Amino acid sequence: MLLVDTNIFLELLLGQDKAERCEKFLEKISSGEIKAVISNFTVHAVEAILNDPTLILAFLRNVQNSSGLDVYETRLEEEMAASMLMDKIKLDFDDALHYFIAKKFEVEAIVSYDKHFDTVDIKRREPTEYL
């Protein structure tokens, strides 16, 4: 199982430089070929950044229909634990929360373009490594 960071979705949805690679990677998750998890925090972050009802609905439908993707709903206690990790692992809150979830699910890697994850004990991978 992999944890997919918010920036992978945004790269595609905002039509950024690596959009095509992210699309192919996310298609493998959608088909169930790759198993992955995201947090409800990721869902809300994408919604807030898109700020367009049509794009948000399309994103949510894709998440809902993705065979290989689970959305993990964090509990308040877990968010508190992630906030206490921030200083120790030198990550901001959203990255610390993703790290916390990655540890909880014992993921193989965090798929992200965020190099801050290179400092933790879980491997960071990029989408092209799964194509």
Where are the regions that the model predicts?
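Short, well-structured N-terminal submotif of metal-dependent ribonuclease cores
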Residues: 1-37, 49-58, 129-131
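Active-site-proximal, substrate-binding regions of enzyme catalytic domains
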Residues: 41-43, 47-70
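A generic structural signal for short hydrophobic patches within well-formed alpha-helices
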Residues: 9, 43, 117-118
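Active-site neighborhoods of divalent-metal-dependent phosphate/nucleic-acid chemistry enzymes
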Residues: 70-113
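Conserved beta-strand segments of alpha/beta enzyme cores
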Residues: 35, 68-70, 109, 123
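Conserved glycosyltransferase catalytic-site signature
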Residues: 6, 40, 95-99
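Structured helix-beta-strand junction loops
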Residues: 32-33, 66-67, 88, 120
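Acidic, PIN/NYN-like endoribonuclease modules and their adjacent C-terminal/linker elements
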Residues: 1, 100, 104-131
